[in-house]
C-alpha cells in the first residue's frame, strides 16, 4: 500500500516532462509509472498541474537565533514552502552570535529543528578569528564555509585577508567542504564609498557608483586563483556581471572546482529600478544595467550558472528607512519568489521546465551533497511542488508569509503559481494554508565522492 499516490500530474524530470502517477511509501518516492495500481492511504489528483521537485535554496539569511525581529526561521521557512521550496541552507552571519564554532552551530540547529517548515542545512563562517574552529564546524555538519571579500555589514563577522582565505581554503579542501565567497573587492568598494560620501553623496546613484562591476570582477579573479592554487571547492554567490561569470566558467573549463550562483533580483531588476523603488532593492553587489541582465540570462542558457539562490536577507523597517542610502540595510526579501521568477521570466527567456527544475532543485541538492533531495526519482525524498503553470496572478502583500510584508516583487504579474508543497510526502503548504506544525529536519552533507 502506498502512503501517498499522486495521480496524473505532469512530472518535471531530468529527461523531460511526462504525465504519470507517483507513489510514495515512508516519505520516499518508490514508483513512477503511467498508471499505478494499488491502494493508498491518501490519493492526490494532480491532473492539470505540473509536479516539480521541491526547490533547494542554498542561500538564505533567516537571522535566528538573535535577530528574529528581522525574520526568523519560522516565518522564513513558511515563505520558502509557500514559494515551492522544501530545503534551505542558512548563512552564518546574521544570527547573534554568528555561527563560528560548534556551540553557535548547534544553537542554530536546535532553533531550526523547533521552527522550520522545511528541511535545512547550515553554513559555518570563515573569518580571521575562527580558522581553528573549521574542523569542529565540519564535524557538526556544516554544508560549507561562508566568507566575505568585502565588509559584511556586521562588525562581528569580519572579512578574511588573503592569507586567512588561503589558509581557510586549504582546510576546507582537506575537510571536503565548499567555500562560498561574497566576491567584491574591499579596497575598491571601501575607497569609492569613502570618497563619494566625503563629497556629500547619499543617494541611490551614489551607492551604485561605489560598487562598480570591476569590484566584483577583480575579487572573482582573485578567488579563482586561490581556489586553483589550493584545490579548494569554490562557490561564488550572487554574481551580478557577465564578465565575472565568464571568468568562472573559463576557470572551470581548465579544472578549477567552482560553482556559480546568481539571484532572481539580478535577473529581474536594474539599477534604474533601484532608483525608482529605493531601499527594497538595495543589495550588494548592487543591481546592474539591462545589458548585464541579458548577459546573466545568456549564461544560464549556456549552462554556466549552476544555481539560483534567493539571498533572502530582510531587516526591520527602520533599517530600510534611512535618509542616507549608504546606511540602509542591504538585503532583499525574495525567498518566496525564486521559483515563481523562474517560471515566469525563465520561460520568457527560453528556459525549459527541466532547466528550471535543474537550477532550482537538482543541481543545488547534488552539488552540496543533500542526499535524496532535488529530483523526482524512485529512492528520492517525496519533496513535491504542484504548480498551475497557466495561472496568472499579481503579487500582493497578502500573499507574503515573511515577517515583514515588503518585497520588490509586489505589484508584479506572474504566470505560474504554486498550489501545494509537500515535504517528504506531507503537505506543508496548500493554497495559503500551513496544515501541519513545523517538521523540518537537519541535513548533513553527504561525504564528497
Curated annotation (Swiss-Prot):
Cofactor(s) the protein requires to work: Zn(2+)
Disulfide bond entries: none
SUPFAM superfamilies: Composite domain of metallo-dependent hydrolases, Metallo-dependent hydrolases
GO molecular function: allantoinase activity; cobalt ion binding; zinc ion binding
Modification after translation (UniProt): Carboxylation allows a single lysine to coordinate two zinc ions.
GO CC annotation: cytoplasm
Biological pathway: Nitrogen metabolism; (S)-allantoin degradation; allantoate from (S)-allantoin: step 1/1
GO biological process per UniProt: allantoin catabolic process; purine nucleobase catabolic process
Record-listed Zn(2+) 2 binding positions: 146, 182, 238
Stored Gene3D superfamilies: Metal-dependent hydrolases, Urease, subunit C, domain 1
Keywords (A to Z) from UniProt: Hydrolase, Metal-binding, Plasmid, Purine metabolism, Zinc
Catalytic activity, reaction form: (S)-allantoin + H2O = allantoate + H(+)
InterPro entries to which the protein is assigned, alphabetical: Allantoinase, Allantoinase_bact, Amidohydro-rel, DHOase/Allantoinase_Hydrolase, Dihydroorotase_CS, Metal-dep_hydrolase_composite, Metal_Hydrolase
Residues where N6-carboxylysine is found: 146
Amino acids binding Zn(2+) 1: 59, 61, 146, 311
One Pfam family from the record: Amidohydro_1
Cofactor note: Binds 2 Zn(2+) ions per subunit.
Purpose: Catalyzes the conversion of allantoin (5-ureidohydantoin) to allantoic acid by hydrolytic cleavage of the five-member hydantoin ring.
Protein family per UniProt: Belongs to the metallo-dependent hydrolases superfamily. Allantoinase family.
Subunit structure, interactors included: Homotetramer.
HAMAP family: Hydantoinase (MF_01645)
Protein name, as recorded: Allantoinase
Underlying gene: allB
